[in-house]
């Protein structure tokens, strides 16, 4: 698959007005999303990855083939993404609540965030194509679902070490085949960092630290093309994104991104 994208920085003061404009353009209300994103890097050379028996036993055969191709092709960072809810933030494991003397244990257990029930998908995104002369950013991408629960041993079996994690917070709109995402990156507070492991639970949302200290957001408009070998389809996709750019030019300036700023290769 190929992803074609345009990007625009959005100051915090413009966030609300742009949400309203995007709602009008797409004729839909914003779909609020929260994603927990774990970053992994390979510790083995390309072509050497051999999953341990049982490491991917819950993944069906087509997914195993896709994973093999995705994770065995080169030294690239990959992200493991889990969708979470607003109510997942600030909930502790029940064992912690019990230790702290919580009196409403039943309700705590029902509503708490449990990483063992977290579903995941692996996202691979290549460095954007070079020398295309295109007005949009284009790059090869691939995604695959993986088992629930503790993802670190699964990724270890594929030859990947955990590096870091963050939360993507934003609003999504759909316009025909274009996904429009107005979002920002939130880092975990220092006290929630574990050596070599993701956090066991999500801190309160208000304790998360914006990557952009000014509170700014990033607007990304993307179209994913399944048949990247079809030049007419690729051209039509570019034209649709440029049409959206023209439509929104009074509010934001959508542009292609600097290629090296999206470099996912392991240095």
Swiss-Prot record:
UniProt keyword annotation of Nuclease present: no
Gene3D superfamilies: Hypothetical Protein Pfu-838710-001 (2.40.320.10)
InterPro entries with a match to the protein in the record: Mediator_Med18
One GO term describing the cellular component: core mediator complex
UniProt-listed GO biological process terms: regulation of transcription by RNA polymerase II; termination of RNA polymerase II transcription
Location of this chain's protein in the cell: Nucleus
Keywords from the UniProt entry: Activator, Nucleus, Transcription, Transcription regulation
Top-rank lineage group of the source organism: Eukaryota
A Pfam family hit: Med18
Keyword Nucleus listed: yes
Gene Ontology molecular function: transcription coregulator activity
Summary of the function given for this chain in its UniProt record: Component of the Mediator complex, a coactivator involved in the regulated transcription of nearly all RNA polymerase II-dependent genes. Mediator functions as a bridge to convey information from gene-specific regulatory proteins to the basal RNA polymerase II transcription machinery. Mediator is recruited to promoters by direct interactions with regulatory proteins and serves as a scaffold for the assembly of a functional preinitiation complex with RNA polymerase II and the general transcription factors.
Similarity comment: Belongs to the Mediator complex subunit 18 family.
Name used for this protein in its record: Mediator of RNA polymerase II transcription subunit 18
Gene that encodes the chain: SRB5
């Amino acid at each position: 698959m190929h992803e074609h994208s345009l990007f625009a920085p959005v100051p915090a003061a413009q966030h609300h007005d742009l949400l309203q404009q995007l709602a009008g353009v797409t004729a839909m209300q914003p779909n609020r999303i929260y994603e927990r994103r774990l970053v992994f890097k390979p510790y083995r050379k390309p072509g050497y990855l051999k999953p341990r028996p049982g490491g991917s036993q819950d993944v069906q055969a087509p997914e195993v083939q896709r994973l093999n191709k995705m994770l065995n092709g080169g030294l690239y960072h990959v992200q493991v993404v889990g969708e979470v809810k607003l109510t997942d933030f600030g909930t502790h494991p029940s064992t912690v609540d019990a230790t702290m003397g919580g009196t409403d244990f039943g309700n705590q257990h029902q509503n708490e965030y449990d990483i063992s029930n977290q579903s995941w998908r692996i996202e691979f995104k290549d460095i954007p194509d070079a020398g295309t002369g295109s007005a949009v950013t284009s790059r090869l991408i691939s995604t695959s679902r993986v088992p629930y629960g503790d993802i670190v041993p699964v990724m270890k079996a594929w030859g990947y070490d955990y590096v870091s994690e963050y939360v993507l917070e934003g609003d999504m709109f759909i316009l025909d085949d274009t996904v429009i995402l107005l979002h920002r990156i939130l880092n975990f507070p220092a006290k929630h960092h574990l050596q070599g492991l993701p956090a066991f639970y999500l801190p309160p949302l208000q304790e998360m630290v914006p990557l952009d200290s000014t509170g700014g957001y990033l607007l990304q408009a993307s179209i994913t093309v399944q048949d990247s070998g079809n030049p007419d389809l690729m051209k039509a996709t570019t034209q649709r994104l440029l049409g959206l750019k023209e439509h929104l030019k009074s509010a934001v300036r959508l542009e292609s991104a600097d290629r090296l700023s999206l470099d996912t290769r392991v240095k």
